[in-house]
Amino acid sequence: TLVHGAALTGGLLQAVSHATAKAGMFMAAGLIYAALGHDRIADMAGVARALPVTVLAFALAGIALMGVVPSGAYLAKKLLLDAAAGSGQWWWTIVLQGGAAFTAGYVVLVLASVLRGRAAAPPVIQRVSRRSEYATLVLAISSLLLACAALGPVPGALLSNPLAPLELGTTLL
């Protein structure tokens, strides 16, 4: 049925989107740790000045994990919420929206610390390669734009065919 197709598509899209965003976020955290020699959030003031590409990747991956448009997590969450509503399983709304709120909380906590001003950037004990920084950024951007790959440019695909995500789900069955 349409509801099961939406749930299947939403679940698969959630898995791929979450994996790419989380990989980008953990890679960014690893680069920050490698550069500073610690992972204490309270001591990260000025990191954005020292590692701007890495912090941008962390922020974009966090936005993707929150499920903001046009991320794959947004489309996945929409499909899963629609499927839950269609099958009377309203409690999934609490789980999905609670997860997004929790994600927003920890992403904002880290970003508030790394973006906090400081006269100078914190001491970098080891330089990280630009290639690693850009690989991290590519993962974050990929997750952020995953819904566009599934539907085409958003919101055009949704405006022309609001059932496009549901029809995509039924083709997978």
Model-found features: residue ranges?
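Predominantly late transmembrane helices and immediately cytosolic-facing juxtamembrane segments
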Residues: 22-26, 90-132, 173
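Interfacial segments of multi-pass membrane proteins
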Residues: 1-3, 76-92
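Short amphipathic alpha-helical coupling elements at transmembrane boundaries
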Residues: 42-49, 116-117
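Membrane-interfacial loop-to-helix junctions in multi-pass transporters
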Residues: 5, 48-57, 87-92, 131-132
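Hydrophobic alpha-helical transmembrane segments of multi-pass small-molecule transporters/permeases
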Residues: 11, 15, 31, 59-65, ...
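Glycine- and aromatic-enriched alpha-helical transmembrane segments of multi-pass membrane proteins
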Residues: 134-155, 165-173
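Membrane-helix interface motif
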Residues: 65-80, 146-163
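Alpha-helical multi-pass transmembrane bundles of energy-transducing inner-membrane proteins
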Residues: 1-42
